Swiss-Prot record:
UniProt-recorded name of the protein: Phenylalanine--tRNA ligase beta subunit
PROSITE patterns (UniProt xref): B5, FDX_ACB, TRBD
Catalytic activity: tRNA(Phe) + L-phenylalanine + ATP = L-phenylalanyl-tRNA(Phe) + AMP + diphosphate + H(+)
Domain B5 span(s) in chain numbering: 406-482
InterPro entries: aa-tRNA-synth_II/BPL/LPL (IPR045864), B3/B4_tRNA-bd (IPR005146), DNA-bd_dom_put_sf (IPR009061), Fdx_antiC-bd (IPR005121), Fdx_antiC-bd_sf (IPR036690), NA-bd_OB-fold (IPR012340), Phe-tRNA-ligase_IIc_bsu (IPR045060), Phe-tRNA-ligase_IIc_bsu_bact (IPR004532)
Annotated Mg(2+) binding sites: D466, D470
Signal peptide as annotated in the record: none
Residue ranges constituting the FDX-ACB domain according to the UniProt record: 707-800
Tagged with keyword Membrane: no
HAMAP family reported in the protein's UniProt record: Phe_tRNA_synth_beta1
Domain tRNA-binding: 39-151
Gene Ontology MF terms in the entry: ATP binding; magnesium ion binding; phenylalanine-tRNA ligase activity; tRNA binding
Protein family membership: Belongs to the phenylalanyl-tRNA synthetase beta subunit family. Type 1 subfamily.
Originating gene: pheT
Length: 803
């Protein structure tokens, strides 16, 4: 946001130097990016009037101009400009003037004739933002005073303050809001300098009809008749809006932009004579269209919020004005001005849908408008229109539906929580004074304040922590004590049943992973490709369209990171991240469930190609080994199970859900090839996701004495269906043998001509031991028979060999 220093000072009741203003803006929480002087240093440039022009007797290219500087001083200026300058007022550097490049203008003789000055161009004077054709001579309007210093005419003793406004301080996106915030820092309340009510009872006989009160709870409008648009915009208005980044066009557009910068509320103006019947706010129907220029129209999608008259759509609400009711400076004499409050959820996405990139659309879509500013804005616009364009105003026609207006925000601010977060003591009286200066109203009840949020902060103050942030910022971060030794610190008792997150991170790092930190906000379109059946949590006030929803998982971040690195020739990538992911769930507060995950992704080739080894692409079992090692930190790895599942996000045959004691704890698999093709991913990507809260408990393993009794080994080869997971076979073996089973290992899997179709041969090695005595062959065979019997009963296996 850019704004004029002079304009800002009009609203400040205290006299501050520029550095102090910058410091206060920074303290508010905004960033002053730079200060741009409106012009470079120069002096002696005057406004002069061209009286006459004649050809130079000795040079065909030059002309001699007679310039009136004041009533007593008329000078000659020799230049190559033409006679079109006669009777026009221009900027002249007279004898002794100093230009921005430090050149001193002196009298010169050109072919025997004296020239006492030069005509100035915008480029010569280095005036910021004035005119695209900066090499043109500065020609001024008829009202310019002859002999006046050009600095005074253009208000050049000014600076442009360039501010980066954070998304949680949208109340500072206008002159009034920023002035209010600065004034509060000096224990001053902002004086309302725009109390200019236009008291009119004239009824010009037009009505508004709101079909969708939920989408448009407030609509204020008035008709102004007999205005004159054939007037030039006053230089102070055009220069102020120009310094704020708006290009001056005509008196009406300039006034609208001026009020927008001043109040933050947009004003819509229609040609009253081009509107048929009532103004109606409604949702569009199928196959409706709107003219946006004389020869161009756009198709309006169904259920878009629009403003229409009897015949056609005249505006896409809060986004784009149509052509049919647009004002014309040559023909318009009656206008309708409107100041409207729309609810952002009914507008969000329309700017992208209709390719409109404007500050107005951005603010309307993100609930960045003060719901109580509409009256002030429409009266301010009316005042300026009447002041410069004359006219006869009608009464304001109000439509206000209190049911759908933003509800008053009441927040409980507890003293205990305030002091716990701040870490130091602030007196109750000072806290209450800070709240008042920031515009909050409060009531103290027992141990908390019941705080009412002002309308201009409703877009960004929602919870107790927002109030604490405001109080600490106002109090001054520089005043926070360095020594916090008196702060009460809670120590958690160290328990052995906690598997720390740091241990997990260290393990993954030791296995070659790199930790990344990514935004919680992700691209909605990419996330929809990865999670097509899940509804993400939208951001009301997103940083950009690429960061418009909360992440459902880390997979979106991983894929974008891997793509970025693959495009830069990184062949081997192993990354992980831990943090919260979010999903919609009505059972939780605010309807949002947040879960803490530790997740990872691998892609590329396992090793570098060399004379002793070939390059191998990472496969499912590589990442499964990493996950199993991570799960071993739990101390009870035997209770984890990997079960294949059907999931559109993963490759159909290369994924597993992970369970711990039959409770879901995570998932692992290869990203679906269809998703990889859509996102133009070169190498296969394998990912895992673990619910940290479900695996962080550490189970101390039981310790046994090492027995002197030797082990017994038995191998069983069986044929089973491909549909039967091997984990189920292992589970049956464990349940059958129990105490005597020391270890079970699958050492061979075979499929070939000797094995019937749809089946596989599995070889299992059982390690058996009795802790107290040597087992006999009879006992061992009895155990094996029991195991085989249970396998046959559950899976209809065929025995190949037992040894």
């Amino acid at each position: 946001m850019n704004l004029s220093e002079i304009w800002l000072r009009e609203y400040l009741s205290i006299n501050l130097d520029l550095n102090e203003i910058i410091n206060r803006i920074t303290k508010i929480g905004l960033e002053v990016e730079k200060i741009i002087p409106v012009s470079m240093k120069f002096s002696g440039i005057k406004i002069g009037k061209v009286i006459s022009c004649k050809q130079h007797p000795k040079c065909k290219k030059l002309k001699i101009f007679l310039i009136k500087i004041n009533n007593k001083n008329i000078i000659n200026v020799i230049s190559d400009y033409d006679k079109s300058l006669i009777n026009k007022k221009i900027a002249v550097a007279v004898n002794g003037s100093i230009l921005p490049n430090r050149t001193i203008v002196e009298k010169k003789f050109l072919y025997g004739y004296e020239s006492c000055g030069i005509f100035c161009t915008y480029d010569q004077l280095k005036i910021f933002g004035l005119k695209e054709t900066s090499k043109d001579i500065i020609v001024l309007d008829k009202n310019a005073i002859i002999g006046e210093d050009i600095k005074n005419y253009f208000f050049l003793n000014d600076n442009i303050i360039c501010i980066k406004v954070s998304h949680n301080r949208c109340d500072c996106l206008n002159i009034i809001g920023l002035s209010r915030a600065i004034s509060s820092e000096y224990n001053e309340l902002l004086e309302n300098k725009l109390i200019n009510k236009i008291n009119s009872t004239k009824d010009y006989g037009f009505k508004i009809k709101i079909n969708e009160p939920e989408a448009c709870p407030k609509y204020l409008t008035r008709k102004i008749k007999y205005i004159n648009l054939n007037v030039n915009t006053p230089i102070w208005i055009s220069e102020r809006i120009r310094r704020s980044g708006f290009k001056p066009k005509n008196i009406i557009i300039d006034i609208i932009n001026y009020v927008f910068i001043e109040t933050g509320q947009t004003i819509k103006i229609f040609d009253a004579d081009k509107i048929s019947g009532n103004i109606t706010v409604r949702f569009s129907k199928e196959k409706e269209s709107m003219m946006i220029s004389k020869n161009k129209k756009i198709i309006i999608q169904k259920n878009t919020l629009v403003v229409s008259d009897k015949n056609s759509i005249i505006e896409i609400a809060g986004i784009l004005l149509g052509y049919s009711a647009r004002i014309d400076s040559k023909t318009t004499i009656n206008i309708i001005i409107s100041s409207v409050l729309y609810r952002s959820k009914f507008l969000f996405g329309n700017s992208v849908k209709y390719c409109i990139n404007s500050d107005l659309a951005y603010r309307n879509e993100r609930n960045m408008i003060d719901p109580n500013i509409q009256h002030l804005a429409i009266n301010r616009a009316t005042e300026l229109i009447l002041r410069f364009c004359c006219g006869s105003p009608g009464k304001i026609i109000n439509y206000i539906n209190n049911k759908f207006l933003p509800k008053k925000i009441l927040i409980k601010l507890y003293k205990k929580k305030l002091y716990e977060i701040l870490g130091f003591f602030i007196s109750k009286k000072l806290i209450e004074n800070i709240l008042l200066l920031l515009g909050y109203k409060y009531e103290f009840i027992k141990n908390y304040w019941k705080v009412s949020v002002p309308s201009w902060r409703m877009c960004n103050v929602k919870i107790e922590e927002d109030l604490i942030s405001d109080i600490s910022r106002f109090y001054g971060f520089e005043k926070i004590p360095i020594d916090l030794s008196y702060k009460k610190i809670k120590y958690n008792n160290c328990k052995y049943n906690i598997n720390t997150l740091n241990n997990a991170k260290k393990l993954l790092t030791n296995r070659g992973y790199q930790e990344i930190i990514s935004y919680t906000f992700v691209d909605k379109n990419i996330q929809n490709i990865i999670h097509p059946n899940k509804i993400p949590v939208p951001i009301i006030n997103p940083i950009s369209t690429e960061m418009s929803v909360l992440r459902l998982s880390f997979f979106t971040n991983f894929i974008q990171t891997i793509l970025y690195n693959q495009n830069r020739q990184t062949k081997y990538i192993k990354i992980f991240e831990s943090g919260f992911c979010f999903s919609k769930n009505k059972k939780y507060k605010l309807g949002i469930k947040q879960s803490f995950f530790i997740s990872g992704a691998v892609s590329g080739f396992k090793n570098v190609e060399s004379w002793y080894s070939k390059q191998r692409e990472i496969d499912f079992f590589d990442i499964k080994g990493d996950v199993e090692t991570l799960l071993y930190l739990n101390g009870n790895s035997s209770d984890f199970e990997f079960k294949t599942c059907k999931n559109k996000e993963f490759h159909p045959g290369k994924n597993s859900k992970i369970f711990f004691k039959k409770k879901y704890v995570g998932i692992i698999g290869e990203i679906n090839p269809n998703i990889q093709n859509k996102l133009d991913i070169k190498n296969r990507i394998f990912v895992f996701e673990l619910l940290w809260d479900n695996i962080k408990n550490f189970y101390v393993p039981k310790i046994y004495n090492i027995s002197d009794i030797p082990f017994n080994y038995r191998d069983i080869s069986i044929v089973i269906s491909n549909k039967i997971p091997i984990i189920e076979v292992i589970k049956i073996c464990k349940d059958s043998i129990k105490k005597e089973l020391i270890n079970i290992n699958i050492f061979d899997i075979y499929q070939g001509k000797e094995i019937k179709k749809g089946h596989k041969s599995i070889s299992i090695r059982l390690t058996l031991q009795n802790k107290n005595y040597n087992m006999t062959n009879l006992e061992i065979n009895s155990i094996l028979e029991k195991c085989i019997c249970n396998l046959k009963k559950n899976f209809l296996i065929e025995i190949r060999t037992i040894c």
